[in-house]
Amino acid sequence: MPSWRVHRDVTGDVYDVLCSMYGGRWPCDIDINEVVEHVVDPDRNPDTVLTVTEKCVCDGKEVDITYCREQSSYVGSGYSRRCIVESRREERGARHHGGLNEVMWRYYLLLAARSYVVDNDRSTKCCWALARALHYAQDSVLSRKVQVVGVFGTYTSGDFHDLVEDALDTYAYGYLKPEILQRLVMEGVNAALREPPMRIRPTHEFFNPDVSVTAVIENAIKATAYTFAKFFEIINYANNRKESIGRVVRRLRLVSGIGIAVLILSILLMAALHQPGITNAMGALLIIGLILTSTWPLYRSFKESELYVLGIVNYPTGMLRIRMRRGASVITETYKPLLT
């Protein structure tokens, strides 16, 4: 929910309007039919998330997990309190509704851009990844309790699933009229254009879940336009910066490689030769090697997302993991995308 028909029609219609309005700015050369077909993939073949909940019980009382780990140092030293760390593992489908699943949305948006820029892909993985990002964007606006005003009162999705889906379908096609669609697409696109291309942390109101059917449809259209615009802005930025960033990274790798070679050479010479003068020279060479080697971490001055889109690094695993506290427990969520 929304129905697959709404997902597909919103995706195709928003793309057509967006490219007719901004075709001079963006290439609009992806296979939109592939995107439309696969925008429902997260419903057919869902991504998953592994949730690990850790809690600590000391003498029958639940305590903070950090305190529990501190007490473990007393084990075997006569400390009387007995602390046990308990963990629970649960794997389930990744969340779609009730707010944007930013982890999965960001992952698929960047994967689509990387496939476009690095693999020159316009019709397969690029489109499939973009379709998944669009699905998460469209579903984010749907609260777990959508209100539908009926003849006998106001109902929620928990009460009347089919009624809500029918209402979304009905309202959606009222909002897919050209004059309304154009206004909503402009709002979504302008939100993307007002921020730097590589800022991948959406905070816009239209990603917030709503209980009104009309607001859900409007926000889904804006979120779709925003996601398309963000994708095209990222690939434009990456293509413009590809040569300059690649050149800098290659130089850093070369200098760092020379530094490692100098380090190894100086250590071997210092071990083989013991004359004071030569040893001092080797010490100086060792320092030079250390300085040269230390230049490689400068690549971190670029954003990880930038380097990933350009094919320089793999996707940072830390960006697929969330750690949070809930009371005395620590919860770790590790997302497992279906498409890699």
Can you describe what each PLM-predicted range is?
Residues M1-W128, V146-A238, R251, G257-A281, ...:
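N-terminal, motif-rich segments that launch catalysis or mediate targeting to/interaction with membranes
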Residues C126-Q138:
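Short alpha-helix carrying the canonical HExxH Zn2+-binding catalytic motif
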Residues Q138-K145:
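Transmembrane alpha-helix/helix-exit interface in multi-pass inner-membrane proteins
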Residues A238-R247:
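Membrane-proximal extracellular "stem/stalk" segments
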